């Protein structure tokens, strides 16, 4: 369930629901020496409060608080349940007519869990992006070019739309293009390393090239 409100330049939302237990926190699992996997499993009640405020016609700030009432943490045979709180704050601003900048920082209070090589799993992270122009699926020929840097700890966020944005420290360069109405082509390249090792062999390099076409109905 969600309740939203708006007052002048202030927007907000209150949310309550339940997350599926088939996912782990940030979609990240860790390998142990016996070949098994462990992580922080969801399947718990979730509540959040979000606020956004327009400081000016070109700048907005936002903050979110979220709480998972009970997360099941399975760590190398040591299972326990814990409530987890999340905080996030960020902003976006228009630097020039065709240039925008955004940045966000997130953190949770889930700690004391180690990764596949014994290091504590990082529970905070940040993301920033610089974007030239904006694409619009209804505007044929519109495009955007973007670059971003992320340092996203595996326990700094509940989940993301795509797994390759989680537990990653590195750069992305890409573009969006609208070849026909209600269609977008996106191409990007991401390079970096894992924040925490998910394999007993240590942190792995991350190199992703992706091209996709999206349709809007």
Feature map (PLM): residue ranges:
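Surface-exposed coil loops of outer-membrane beta-barrel proteins
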Residues: 1-88, 155-166
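Outer-membrane beta-barrel pore domains
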Residues: 56-217
């Amino acid at each position: 369930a969600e309740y939203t409100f708006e007052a002048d330049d202030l927007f907000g939302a209150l949310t309550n629901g339940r997350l599926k237990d088939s996912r782990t926190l940030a979609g990240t699992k860790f390998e142990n020496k016996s070949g098994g996997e462990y992580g922080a499993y969801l399947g718990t009640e979730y509540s959040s409060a979000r606020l956004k405020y327009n400081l000016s016609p070109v700048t907005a700030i936002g903050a979110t608080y979220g709480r998972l009432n009970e997360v099941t943490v399975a760590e190398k045979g040591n299972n326990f349940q814990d409530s987890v709180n999340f905080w996030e704050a960020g902003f976006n601003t228009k630097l020039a007519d065709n240039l925008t900048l955004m940045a966000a920082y997130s953190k949770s209070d889930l700690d004391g869990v180690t990764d596949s090589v014994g290091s504590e799993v990082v529970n905070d992270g940040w993301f920033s992006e610089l974007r030239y122009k904006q694409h619009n699926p209804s505007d044929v020929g519109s495009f955007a070019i973007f670059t971003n840097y992320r340092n996203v700890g595996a326990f700094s966020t509940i989940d993301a739309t795509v797994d390759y944005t989680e537990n990653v420290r590195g750069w992305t360069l890409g573009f969006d293009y609208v070849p026909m109405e209600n269609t977008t082509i996106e191409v990007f390249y991401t390079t970096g390393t894992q924040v925490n090792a998910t394999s007993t062999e240590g942190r792995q390099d991350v190199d992703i090239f992706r091209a996709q076409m999206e349709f809007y109905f």
